[in-house]
Amino acid sequence: MHYVDPNQSGSKIHFKDQYENFIGGQWVAPVKGVYFDNISPVDGKSFTRIPRSSAEDIELALDAAHKAKKEWNKSSPTTRSNLLLKIADRMEANLEMLAVAETWDNGKPVRETLAADIPLAIDHFRYFAGCIRAQEGGISEIDEDTIAYHFHEPLGVVGQIIPWNFPILMAAWKLAPALAAGNCVVIKPAEQTPVGILLVAELIQDLLPAGVLNIVNGYGAEVGRPLATSPRIAKIAFTGSTQVGQLIMQYATENIIPVTLELGGKSPNVFFADVMDHDDDFLDKTLEGFAMFALNQGEVCTCPSRALIQESIADQFMEKAIERVKRIKLGHPLDTDTMVGAQASLEQQEKILRCIDTGRQEGAEVLLGGHGRQEVGNGYYIEPTIFKGHNNMQVFQEEIFGPVLSVTTFKDFDEAIQIANDTMYGLGAGVWSRSTHTAYRAGRAIEAGRVWTNCYHIYPAHAAFGGYKKSGVGRENHKMMLDHYQQTKNLLVSYSTKAMGFF
């Protein structure tokens, strides 16, 4: 099936010529009246205009959020839970529209937005609707007359900066627990992909009290920095590059506020020899796991961009693996048969191609791909690319954020772990083995926040996600996220009528 391009007869989505910021429950033009063109990576053409906001717009959003927090912070868990469920229902009723819009804004295949991005976003709202209803405080008996009560209280107003690789889903990852915990939110979407969360806001604006959700568009230095440095937020959450994450952490220290950072990765995908013991469903699954570097055009922080293959099976495994990758269909993102779509921006496409050139220059062998492709108009397409080399090469160490895989080999278990951990990152990893003993040992030994074992790229709402080393601080998903958006109030009460006897 091929979905009709936006703004055409029969299309699932008709974009407005221009969008505004969402502040205090209203659609508000930027203070300075400046806009920028939003380019679709599918064809390289502008399809709408987005506010190029400034610090003044951030202040307006913070005004609205602080006004709303007086009531929202005190709202009952039931109220918040029911609202999150309504948000999920509204999104589900418009799933196809959101999926097509997200594809046009980001370039990813519609098969992914239909089956993963939007359904997962919906599920996150439902999951945290359940979590907040189930959350309990605590009581500690100090002695027979003294009790310590522990209450969960919202932080107040929080800032969130959303990346461009999963715009709606990453917004849901942050927004759902923040709202469930009773906070008001100011979101800054990525300037490359701002439309998706604006469409969600249009769908749910009648559900939310004014000021609980505020969205301010613009560039990082002009909007993101004023938000992250504001003394009026009680927390900042950011997903993006490690370099920008370091700045966000510095900003947070100035105001002594908590920070959640989900940053870069160079994830190892480790294939032990026993995966080739039989030509069966498990081997087929393993080969799919190898090809997962191309999911979302490789624009995933946990992209399995390093494949480590045991020497004894390297030749025969790679023969099958390359054939599997050759079957990946690159094409128009609105075609449901397309498996790899467009890179999210011209800037990103050019960066990936430079990294591919660097790989060639440093002696890495190109086993497959290695070139840009013209698919739709002037869209930003790159062939899935496989390099063969060693772990000291730049293509093994630097995050490329594209459909580029670097392959090397290892002799034994210890060398596999040594190579896997030889990186400054620690966000994700994959382990493939028929031996549960080997898989478990490897999973525990690899320094990463999530280790997929005989699977990859599964992102359930109730599994904690986050990085080791320079891949970030804190976690996302799982019920523990409520704690990340709350603070604990201890009420220590004496029920005794007698003095303590000190004075």
UniProtKB/Swiss-Prot annotation:
pH dependence: Optimum pH is 9.5.
EC code(s) of this entry: 1.2.1.48
UniProt catalytic activity: a long-chain fatty aldehyde + NAD(+) + H2O = a long-chain fatty acid + NADH + 2 H(+)
PROSITE patterns: ALDEHYDE_DEHYDR_CYS, ALDEHYDE_DEHYDR_GLU
Enzyme class: oxidoreductase
One of the GO BP terms on file: protein homotetramerization
One GO MF term attached to the UniProt entry: long-chain fatty aldehyde dehydrogenase (NAD+) activity
Notes on temperature effects: Optimum temperature is 43 degrees Celsius.
List of catalytic residues: 262, 301
Residues that hold NAD(+) according to the record: 218-224
Activity regulation comment: Completely inhibited by p-chloromercuribenzoate and N-ethylmaleimide. Strongly inhibited by iodoacetate. Inhibited by Pb(2+), Fe(3+), Ag(+) and Hg(2+) and partially inhibited by several other metal ions Mn(2+), Zn(2+) and Cu(2+).
Disruption phenotype: Reduced aldehyde dehydrogenase activity toward n-tetradecanal, although cells are still able to grow on n-hexadecane to some extent.
Alphabetical UniProt keywords: NAD, Oxidoreductase
InterPro entries per record: Ald_DH/histidinol_DH, Ald_DH_C, Ald_DH_CS_CYS, Ald_DH_CS_GLU, Ald_DH_N, Aldehyde_DH_dom
Known function: Aldehyde dehydrogenase that shows activity toward n-alkanals (C(4) to C(14)), with a preference for longer carbon chains. The best substrate is tetradecanal.
Self-association state and partner proteins as the record states: Homotetramer.
Family: Belongs to the aldehyde dehydrogenase family.
Protein name: Long-chain-aldehyde dehydrogenase
